[in-house]
Amino acid sequence: ARDVDVLPFPDGLDARLVDVLRGQGYEGLYGHQARAIAAALDGQDVLITTPTASGKTLAYTLPVMQKLLETKGRARSLWLFPTKALSQDQSKVFNTRIEELGEDWHSYTYDGDTPPSVRRTLRERGQVILTNPWMLHQGILPNHSKWADLFANLSHVVIDEVHTLSGVFGSNVAGVLRRLRRIANHYGADPKFLMSSATLRNAQEHGALLAGREVTLIDQDQSPSGERIFGVYNPPMVNPVAGLRKNALEEARRIALTLVGPSHQSIFFCNRRTSVEVLTRYLKECAGRMGIKPEEVRGYRGGYLPGLRREIETDLKEGRVKVVVTTNALELGIDIGSLDVAVLVGYPGSQASFWQRVGRVGRRGSSSLAVMISRSDPVDQYLCAHPEYLFDAPRERLGVDPDNPVILSEQIKCAAFELPFRSEIDAATGDEVVRDFGPSPHVVDILDYFTEESGFLLKSKDTWYFTQDAYPAGDVSLAGNEPDNVVIFDAESGDAIGEIDREGSITAVHEGAIYQVEGETWKIERFDYENRRAYGRKVASDYFTDAHTEVEVRVLRLEERHRRGLTDDPAEDFSIWRGEVHVTTLATLYKKIRFYTRENVGAEDIHLPPEELDTDAFVLTVSNESLARLLEGEDLIADRGSTWHALGALLKRVAPLFLRCKSADLGVSAQLASGNFKRPALFLFDRHHGGIGLVKLFFDAWDEVFSAALEVLRHCECSHGCPACVGPPEEAGPEGKRAVGLLLEHLIAGGRPAATSDLEPEPAGEAAGTEEEALRG
């Protein structure tokens, strides 16, 4: 529990706003609200990072309303949210405050569902436009002349949930915000940024990269917090030899019989969509035993149709739903009311996500309970043995790099379509520079490349003009790989019942799959893979399906290489490569799993083409002899396979700190017997089609990344491995931490440049050595 710290309303806050707040029962503001509002009224860019339900919305709403009062409604603001639901939720909140103030102002949501008739109205009359980064990128900025009044009077840009802006997506959004500032400046405005976020490890840096300038950080939560009881529950063992425990979903159902009731609301978080549907079915079927009705149990996840999601959100907020089972779809700050119990079925994979889920309960000072049910997964089991990790481990850092060469080039292309670029001569250096698109020294080089090589820019004196009819923003994906959704239809009625991203479709809506929505089941009869449509017939199924995939990495071309010597024997050299690879993900078969008993009642093959990805990869190869010698000496007996996989897991965790991306932007494949190299090979590949330059950055700084990984091991307080380093001992092996440390030491310090170090790419047929021969084959 935490006591509240209330401060007086900031000096300068309009008396009309103060009167409205006092009429609502406010005697002042929480300390963090008051400081954030005071900084905003002083003209500063502000980032407030406090937990869910700490009143962040008021901290950015009041400065916007103050500016509207000062300008008699002429000021305009743009609010960015990561989801449509959040935009619509906040629009309702803001319109309520407008009514309380008695002003004739208007706020509108602008997204893909906004009718054309409304779009013209909101462009002309909307003091507040609530939208998302995708609509800003493809809808507003390229058509800025239609939004001239908005940009000319733009006083504030509000960005909510900025912790969701990381990796490739966050880097692209930072580029979009550069374009926004550039256009606003063109119309004579210089908007201030008001941002909110969950707690971050590098909040100040993250906010500055998004805003393009320093921000004032408000990070001390001074809102009230009721008592919150935490529990970590480890299901009983059913097979000690195999380390298997009772199924977490079954245990969640059993725990619900005790925790769920008609007098309070509960939320259950699952990490997979299938788990959401299975648990929703279980809880609906035992609703009577919990004192509630089946219709008071709802599922909620991505893929539900928008109307269904809005219905569930409203029923949650108004108390008609007693239990909701969800994925991370309800982690974000949409207002669903004050919940009392949170049950996490498994660790969600990050501290940020864990605390977002736990933060859904205990709002507004009430007492609450949060329980995590562990699975047999090694990470979950580690957290059962070391629950202090959940509270003591530092939050993850967020990586954003708007100057990544590929991302910067794409955003410059979009910006050139919107407005010409102009350069000037730097008085100190004599260099030609462009000053309105961030600090990168490569902006002029990129513009010249687009002029001389690509031909879609024309340079006249100091100005670059876009010369083609192309619409570049339409071809630039903010997420790197734009989702290509599959729509699922009821085969009898023809109605759409859901949607799913293409990557997930091969395991969820293949022919024979059981597709579930809130406990109801459809058997997929036909999957039109090319046209992205699946058709299912409603059935009363007593089983669900679980599909398996295989991932294969094949080398296409190697471009750069470093060779290092571990000993005087060239056979024990190790090599680091950068090249192009082909990654295939193939759905191979699916199992039919009986509800409740989890009995496997059959398996069938899946007949779908593989998902294919041509991308860049960083490759580490070591001879079998070297790996065996390193791991079997110094009184160390370590499993080579576990150690090799643990090294890959550690590098995947550490690399984003150098590449300014998310861990999810990288894929890893650890092979003890690579078909390309005939020796152990570790692949770290860019998960975006064609690659976006992450691998080149990794290759150029591999020794720094390896050294940082070794430092992580040395400073980690665990004894034999944990989720923060190489993974739990059950996953990395009992000697995994020590083995990976020794391997890194030899790779960094023990390795020395071999005679063939820093080789240029060799033509096929002229290479020497086992690795090159294998590649030729």
Question: What is each stretch, according to the model?
Answer:
Residues P51, P235, G303, S623-E625, ...:
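Short strand-loop junctions, especially beta-strand C-caps/beta-turns
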Residues A1-Q24, G28-G31, R35-T57, T61-H137, ...:
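Helicase motor core with emphasis on the C-terminal RecA-like subdomain
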Residues A40, L283, V726-P729, L744:
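A general structural motif at alpha-helix termini
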Residues R537, A724-G727:
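Terminal or standalone catalytic/regulatory effector modules within metabolic enzymes
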Residues S367-A370, S376-P394, D401, V406-R422, ...:
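Extended Lys/Arg-rich polyanion-binding regions
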